[in-house]
Amino acid sequence: MKKKPFVTLEKLQEITAKYPTPFHLYDEKGIRENARALKDAFAWNKGFKEFFAVKATPNPYLIKILQEYGCGCDCSSMTELMLSKAIGCKEGDIMFSSNDTPEEEFRYADEIGGIINLDDITHIESVEKAVGGIPKTISCRYNPGGLFKISNDIMDNPGDAKYGMTTEQIFEAFRILKAKGAEEFGIHAFLASNTVTNEYYPMLAKVMFELAVKLQKETGAHIKFINLSGGIGIAYSPDQTPNDIKAIGEGVRKVYEEVLVPEGMGDVAIYTELGRFMMGPYGCLVTKAIHEKHTHKEYVGVDACAVNLMRPAMYGAYHHITVMGKEDQPCDHMYDVTGSLCENNDKFAIDRYLPKVDMGDLLVIHDTGAHGFAMGYNYNGKLKSAEILLHEDGSFEMIRRAETPKDYFATFDCFPIYERLLEDNK
């Protein structure tokens, strides 16, 4: 499948005339269409709710779009909780799934009406101490261990993951929580990441639904919801077939009716915590070719770097690249596309065949809408870029400004050197 940018060269030239590269650009039209598709795919479940994984794209202007489609927020830190509260999340709109959690974060999550999802059985005591008791509604994260397989393919290795409780622990946790006053329970699991198959969610659902039946029978706990978390991936590479969310929703429905309904559990709500699927394809990193180097290899240097998109450097992840205006030209030049960090892994592409790149060309790096800007950092003193939203009507606006040296040096503002640091930036 050929990957096409959601923005034209002409529109990009209009945007770059106002906002300098590099920047992350988001597609409002795509975000809305995808949110509607998810909602429709699970419309069969009366209590369905998506809790957007804030960690993927922590921008309030983008999350507020998702709120229009009934989405809540999946948070894992104090600042994510603060952001969610600020955009109007109410009781029941926040799922707090964290690990190694400070007590003050449990306390704040409870204060703002978040549902606490316990990562470990020892956290029961921490929550009880932090909030002065056990919340009436609470969730536990499950890790069955071993390998998670679909057919003969290993999807991931839950047994090697730091998250969640064992089977024995989650049964014990439910008994303890029920004895301490919890009235409504949820179970949660994340067993594989970025799966590009329509089978993952139905397979996970079967595991979770069967667990829910046993938990309710053996502990007497009322299971209110089952959180399938994230894991639905996106097609980063042109040779991958995107997931079909309608088929995924239908697959989960079939398992729901096979496992839960006969046990009198047809009122259990399905929750999801999708991040990558909700935003990934609807963001791109726009950068400009500013240098070329001809040594042992052919290099194209761009004005973005791993600070703007860490995934290729950190994971060796593939992100498709389009040289704007040259989409129909032959990809007959092999390049390493590099940033300016003092690290040799600061490469967006290695040995990538592209059309001939001329200096000043605009390059679109695809599928950066999740875990793109969010994973940015300041190594080498680099500053994080702006975020721009392309509206459905073709207009655009900045939804986060680029960092400045003042931002970078802000934590020195209580020291005498602060003013000297900013002498040339006033």
Which role fits each region the language model picked out?
Residues 1-136, 171, 177-179, 183, ...:
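A charged N-terminal "starter" segment
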Residues 58-61, 102, 147-148, 193-197, ...:
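Flexible loop/turn segments at secondary-structure boundaries
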Residues 133-147:
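Glycine-rich, aromatic-flanked loop segments that form ligand/cofactor-binding clefts
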Residues 144-291:
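Active-site loop/helix belt of alpha/beta enzymes
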Residues 260, 265-426:
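Charged (often Lys/Glu-rich) extended helix/loop segments that serve as interaction or gating elements
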